[in-house]
């Protein structure tokens, strides 16, 4: 605890933070309180990142509220915030920061499935960000936590939902109690789950899957990809920092995805203490 305490920095430094998610916000908060000048840059128009998207899922409104409160807190402190501002090698060269923290998060994995680029296909992140969603029949590819939350989200909007999972069970990464709670909620919705099932092809109004060696067709007005996430590439930013001799820290989902929120926050805090 002693080594993790916030102490005034011996010298104030300009720190460029790439990404306004929960990790970037935590880094900005800790840096400012230590006496540094953090510049928090977010490529989108709002702060909060994955926490805001997660808050759109059923029973997760607290996530969204926590993200908004954290963002409001650093605004009240006086942290310099730049939305609609992605951090690029050119920006790093122009700002000449003393350090850079990369917290640009993750993006959904899009599998190499014929038809995955069709107009009826949407990433889970983008779906949860939409205000108005309507789909008569929806197929969700992936039965992890995000996939099941998306399924419940769509069912709550009146859609008939089928989840396609290649493993022998869904929600594999969850503890037993959370699995039970999620299954109970799903039982009240129009959600069909197909395990040991592989998506073979996506067409304009149907999805071809294979289960037990047999192909079948699933009617689909909407197909949602929810098979996992991977870090948003940041090697160009890291290389720019290395060439300029600027200390660079990669935290949260930008380092490895997916991460627990507490891990991302802890990494951001530790990075802020290291500067």
Label the predicted regions.
Residues 8-47, 82-96, 103-120, 124-176, ...:
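Rossmann-like dinucleotide/flavin-binding elements
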Residues 202-205, 222:
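Short, solvent-exposed coil/turn segments at beta-strand boundaries
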Residues 192, 200, 216-218:
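Residues that recognize and position ribonucleotide moieties
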Residues 201-202, 250:
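Generic beta-strand structural signal
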Residues 102-103, 194:
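Short, conserved beta-strand edge motifs with alternating hydrophobic and charged residues
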Residues 1-9:
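Ferredoxin-type iron-sulfur electron-transfer modules in oxidoreductases and energy-metabolism complexes
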Residues 49-97, 172-198, 205:
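N-terminal Rossmann-like dinucleotide/flavin-binding domain of flavoprotein oxidoreductases
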